[in-house]
Each structure stands twice: as C-alpha cells, then as structure tokens.
Design a protein with these regions (language model features):
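Metal-dependent phosphodiesterase/phospholipase catalytic core, i.e.
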Residues: 1-74, 88-98, 108-110
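C-terminal active-site rim and adjoining tail of enzyme catalytic domains
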Residues: 68-148
Length: 148
C-alpha cells in the first residue's frame, strides 16, 4: 500500500509510528502527505536512527513528535546519546533495551520520553512498562496485550 492508503486506515485517536529509513530527501514529501491526511498531528510519531533527519523534521514541523532510534548494540555513551537527542529537539529516544533500568531512568530524567522496540516477550514488556516506557513496538500485539 501507499503511505496515503496506510494513513487512511488509522482510526481516530490511534497513533502511527513512521520510520524514516532514508535521508533528508523524504522530509518534504512526507510532510506534504501528512498535511493532506485527516490525521491529527498528535497521532503521528516520526522515528529514525538518523539524527539529521529528526533535526530537519523538527525544524520544518516541530509539532510532530519524533524519536531518535538507538540500538544498544552500538554501545554508545548514554549521556552523549541524550545530549544528541536534546540538540536535535527529539521528543524522546526509542531503543531495543531489555535489561537496563539505568538507561531508561537517565533518558526519562533528562525530560525525554522513552520508547521500546521490538519486544515480543511479555515479561520484558511488563518490566519496561514499569520502568516508564511510553510505547512498545512488537511483532505480535494481540498476544502481548493478552499476556500483560
């Protein structure tokens, strides 16, 4: 399906997370598509591993929520990651963290939101919710919801 077709399927009050996997060239066409859709800006979350993409998005349309994606395999200094997210005006950081409450606490104490991906284990999901994760991306939402 096209992005426009997908946007039309999102029920009122539900969120869509759009991951940008390419570069800056997508920002303008994406924002045009979003502005033509009937979605409320509060229901759109843009996510990317690419800090310049998030920065450009926030400079163009700061009202859209954005999350900087981070893979724990990258083993970055968390304070530097938080500083980078704050510099580009990201609303939060989303990681594949399953075991570090300290990481979650540091992100939340900086004023940023914390989000989780891709979590399919209900015990891990329950723990991340207790730690303060605002959202959890999963491959099996129905099963995960039933278990937690």
């Amino acid at each position: 399906p096209t992005l426009d077709e997908v946007l039309q399927t999102i029920p009122n009050g539900r969120k869509i997370y759009i991951e940008i996997k390419c570069g800056l060239e997508i920002i303008s066409p994406l924002l045009n598509q979003l502005s033509e859709s009937s979605l409320n800006k509060d229901d759109v979350v843009i996510i990317s591993f690419d800090a310049p993409v998030i920065k450009a998005l926030k400079e163009s349309k700061p009202e859209y929520k954005s999350l900087l994606l981070y893979s724990c395999e990258d083993n970055r200094n968390i304070d530097e990651l938080i500083d980078d997210a704050l510099k580009i005006n990201a609303n939060g950081i989303s990681t594949d963290n399953e075991s570090s409450q300290l990481l979650v606490d540091k992100i939340l104490s900086s004023g940023l939101e914390y989000h989780s991906w891709t979590i399919d284990d209900s015990e891990v999901a329950r723990k991340l919710i207790q730690w303060g994760s605002s959202s959890i991306t999963t491959n099996d939402p129905k099963s995960l919801i039933q278990k937690i």
